[in-house]
């Protein structure tokens, strides 16, 4: 199906099949559509509302065209990722959590990009930390094998997305493409914590990942609007495990933590986010650093559970707490920087 036919269908509020959507996305991502067609398609899809079949088709096309990272095994390899767009501007919780997960002995294949709407995306933060981002897929795999964590910069692995970049920027609205990043990890991980910008997406994205073969995934949105677990409010979870989806609310107290406000966790830049994270992963000299550490532990615990490294969310949080207090997470951050510096020299001379 071509994009013109698809548009006439969508404008009539008719859904596309998975295969039809895959075909249209291939057209878009191989440069066969005009900016006007892509913009109209994104807007029409948003107004109609995307079906599960359509999201599965879009994700399938994007995965096919990605520069994949081949790992020795995907057993227990996890990604902690969010759609962004929650407007909260708090520090990079999922990225910081990833280093605690690695410190706990669990392998992390982190996928991320620059900020969507916030002040600091995962790529912005890691760049500020001196981590080289423009790695080849083989180099990312070597990071994961040697350090226990590697970062896949979305722009490097999803080059075909460049064709939609202009229309996305010009529209300035959330579209289907905002959902695709967390669902298109180039290593093909089967274990994830996926934060989303609205609770309404939790169940649908869990169903999409179920259709695409994921093993254990938590799709989450907190009552106070975050695309991650919150210390300040209950968090809604759609959990895919054993090919079944269950939905529930989680309070910090359920996991052995204390509810508290997010005051002091908002950042204005990647450098400010990095400073807070280094304090949280280090000696926690400030009150805000201590609070950030607890937010990190909460989300790292969820990732350890999703990776089947822990048998429950509560056990995952306890393991994450222990891992953070060893100081090893801070060491992992520095180690990844040193490891990627070698690749920078190889790639840039």
Curated annotation (Swiss-Prot):
Q: Which GO CC terms are listed, alphabetically?
A: cytosol
Q: Keywords assigned by UniProt?
A: Amino-acid biosynthesis, Aromatic amino acid biosynthesis, Glycosyltransferase, Magnesium, Metal-binding, Transferase, Tryptophan biosynthesis
Give the binding site residues for anthranilate 2.
Answer: 168
Kindly list the cofactors needed. Mg(2+)
Kindly list the GO molecular function terms attached to this UniProt entry: anthranilate phosphoribosyltransferase activity; magnesium ion binding
Q: Which Pfam families match?
A: Glycos_trans_3N (PF02885), Glycos_transf_3 (PF00591)
Pathway given for this chain reads:
Amino-acid biosynthesis; L-tryptophan biosynthesis; L-tryptophan from chorismate: step 2/5
- Which EC number applies? 2.4.2.18
Residue numbers binding anthranilate 1 = 82, 113
Reaction equation(s) it catalyzes: N-(5-phospho-beta-D-ribosyl)anthranilate + diphosphate = 5-phospho-alpha-D-ribose 1-diphosphate + anthranilate
Annotated Mg(2+) 2 binding lies at 227-228
- Does Magnesium count among this protein's keywords? yes
Query: What does the protein in this record do?
Result: Catalyzes the transfer of the phosphoribosyl group of 5-phosphorylribose-1-pyrophosphate (PRPP) to anthranilate to yield N-(5'-phosphoribosyl)-anthranilate (PRA).
The protein's name? Anthranilate phosphoribosyltransferase
